[in-house]
């Protein structure tokens, strides 16, 4: 299996989070994008501020590697209008894919109409501009029943408003990789959670983010029906190695 075409190679830490300078962060992003281009990874996933730079790098290399960014990251509690403004700026900067953090807290509080409205508006903006859209549901905060319910909500909003013909361009994604769990519990994709997402979001696509640390696990995810894998160790996984990175 050519696992490279399933990999979204990812660097999302801010300079403060990584304990490095802004220029060092920019260099890390450049390294990630170059690595994605050289290894023909499906996509490089980066913060919005780096989209323009990354786009220029991909153009210069005449590469098919896509550029993706995160919206409403990482808490997901931004007002919908703020998420849409951030997404529109990324579109203006020539991003290929938009990974929104859904307002999972609102979902847990029973504010279903708010979540439906957000999913509709965010998806419409992306699809109207020929961008793939992913909805991060942050599985570490959800029960299995909530994973099922939120996956079904996103699926139903997309199918009811945009039709099955757009299902291949919308994903339910597991995790941000930034949620802090207690007692060493995983904050990224698990096989159990991804099985629930795949079964309850199809015909939409599914992205497993975080927690995949080796080639065999990546292949197992794909065979389960996962169509993208977000990881900060794409090269290690592609080369058949194992990583201790949490995302």
Residue ranges and their predicted role:
Residues 48, 52-73, 112-134, 141, ...:
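Alpha-helix-loop-beta-strand connector modules within alpha/beta enzyme cores
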Residues 2-14, 43-46, 65-72, 98-100, ...:
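Hydrophobic faces of well-ordered beta-strands that scaffold small-molecule active sites
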Residues 78-93, 142-153, 194-204, 212-227:
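Catalytic cores of alpha/beta
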Residues 1-80, 92, 153:
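Conserved N-terminal beta1-alpha1 strand-loop-helix module at the mouth
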